[in-house]
Swiss-Prot record:
Keywords: Adaptive immunity, Cell membrane, Disulfide bond, Glycoprotein, Immunity, Immunoglobulin, Immunoglobulin domain, Membrane, Secreted. PANTHER family: TAPASIN. Residues 267-287 have a biased composition (Basic and acidic residues). Glycans are attached at S238, T255, T256, T260, T261, N354, N445, N496. It comes from the Eukaryota. Residues 130-512 are annotated as: Constant (C) domain. InterPro entries: Ig-like_dom (IPR007110), Ig-like_dom_sf (IPR036179), Ig-like_fold (IPR013783), Ig/MHC_CS (IPR003006), Ig_C1-set (IPR003597), Ig_sub (IPR003599), Ig_V-set (IPR013106), IgD_del_linker (IPR049351). Immunoglobulins are composed of two identical heavy chains and two identical light chains; disulfide-linked. An IgD molecule contains thus a delta heavy chain combined with either a kappa or a lambda light chains. Kappa light chains are found predominantly on the membrane IgD (mIgD) form and lambda on the secreted IgD (sIgD) form, this fact is poorly understood. Membrane-bound IgD molecules are non-covalently associated with a heterodimer of CD79A and CD79B. Residues 1-129 are annotated as: Variable (V) domain, involved in antigen recognition. Residues 1-97, 135-227, 304-392, 396-502 form the Ig-like domain. This is Immunoglobulin delta heavy chain. Immunoglobulins, also known as antibodies, are membrane-bound or secreted glycoproteins produced by B lymphocytes. In the recognition phase of humoral immunity, the membrane-bound immunoglobulins serve as receptors which, upon binding of a specific antigen, trigger the clonal expansion and differentiation of B lymphocytes into immunoglobulins-secreting plasma cells. Secreted immunoglobulins mediate the effector phase of humoral immunity, which results in the elimination of bound antigens.
Amino acid sequence: RLQLQESGPGLVKPSETLSLTCIVSGGPIRRTGYYWGWIRQPPGKGLEWIGGVYYTGSIYYNPSLRGRVTISVDTSRNQFSLNLRSMSAADTAMYYCARGNPPPYYDIGTGSDDGIDVWGQGTTVHVSSAPTKAPDVFPIISGCRHPKDNSPVVLACLITGYHPTSVTVTWYMGTQSQPQRTFPEIQRRDSYYMTSSQLSTPLQQWRQGEYKCVVQHTASKSKKEIFRWPESPKAQASSVPTAQPQAEGSLAKATTAPATTRNTGRGGEEKKKEKEKEEQEERETKTPECPSHTQPLGVYLLTPAVQDLWLRDKATFTCFVVGSDLKDAHLTWEVAGKVPTGGVEEGLLERHSNGSQSQHSRLTLPRSLWNAGTSVTCTLNHPSLPPQRLMALREPAAQAPVKLSLNLLASSDPPEAASWLLCEVSGFSPPNILLMWLEDQREVNTSGFAPARPPPQPGSTTFWAWSVLRVPAPPSPQPATYTCVVSHEDSRTLLNASRSLEVSYVTDHGPM
């Protein structure tokens, strides 16, 4: 079985030359009818063909890299190599060597990679002036001394200060690997990377086992194993004083039974003072029990959709909270600083497959209140957290659209093909806008057109938006008239533009 294996540096400095080698095993590189090439994939992008060599000796390069790239074959060692000069940050990518069938070049970016039949595993190459550095690893644990019996204990490894990316994290209980969650890497301002990984385990299981997280950083050839975690609740049980429960997550006053042994002499007084000092430290640092949630709560406020403002003459606000335990969470509303007397709809607590929970509350007001600039506030209340408030306020400097156009992008040629219409609207603020299509005054299903999120206009505080409608070939000689309808929260009327594909006219209207 033919196998390909890339080798080379994982880190290259800007302006230097990247040298990679692909070792071929399981078959001769001289075999006729094949092409040997290099392909790369930058982060977040598609595959990009670099170049390759045909068995006849002909070499082909990507035109965008010509002048920087050299590919050569060493048949005596059964390998082929890549040299890429003048490296820059744009050359950071996963590099693959591959074997393909004729033709000897492929536009991988368009998906025509059917000719590739053998791939290497790939090697990550980073272009940076920062030196290679192994990560620092720190153990973290849930910060509670009295976990609930039915609550999980969350262990975490903070992995930081390494370069280049990336690291591999594996969790073990004893010798058994454990399912874990590793978060996406973040590049710090100093160009070094950081990430974290966490493991959630039942309290009883944590008391019985030994846990470790293993971090491997290929570029620095380092491997770090973190074994030691803070002392378990089982070991602390004998020294824990009786706690008087208070609000969950707040500091509690801890008390112990009075000593029954009479202290005599100076030695007894010193022991008594030491014991009082220990009790004081316990009172200052101990919480009665872990809050039932293990992840921070996130609260979000959605402002009214333009559809509701126009079609229902209502302003609907949705406030929702996400976390791992929301049974004690409560959402409240204020309108202009006062509690509303109606219009509030409470959603049910929802549990999701990833272990998280969500809950929402919806407030509906007359559109006139929102247009008048009335403030709307949603507050998340939870026993273990300070209140979290989010306020929605209509932009005072709103501006209605000033220009609407409807153009034919492509006509049906041949006649049985589809046509495309482009509707553009500009000069409005804020960016919330409703754009819909009508076919002979009937609303077109949203699956038939593609709207775009309004970007800001260059050099202006206003926005513009567009939508493309696919018009299928007419089933009869009588074509339909298509209308683009636009509404904005600051518009007094609906704007519309129409076009008939047969007579090719455009009319721009004000109110419908």
